[in-house]
Amino acid sequence: MARVRQATRIPVTAGQCEITSHGVRRLVDAGAVDFVNYDVSEGGGVTDWRRAAEICRAAGVRMAHHEESQISRELLAGVPHGTYVECFADPDRDPVWQAMWANRPRVRNGCMEVSREPGFGIQLDWKMVERYRIA
């Protein structure tokens, strides 16, 4: 992937399939990426995501995130090299994302508000949860 990055001026993003900050370090050390979109829910949680973010910051690589905008908006806002939140705000593309929040953040002009609530600021819509409950 480093050769692809060297052959183009198009920024390269990768990391959504990594499950640890060690995998992120390999991408960064190889010079393979301009952005890392390490997924906190697929990887080692918030602590490991922050570890990966520090690896990237030290190397001048920007952070993004793969999906889970309800979590990534807070993480990316908390690091100086955080960039974009991946969000499927179109109800036809992701109707569950539209319905799962009691306090869904506004997406306006391509930007999502960061919560002022404690933690991730997530308040689930329990009617929606009940509708999809299996047991």
Describe the predicted segments one by one.
Residues 68-135:
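Flexible C-terminal active-site loop/helix
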Residues 1-66, 102:
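Catalytic core of soluble alpha/beta enzymes
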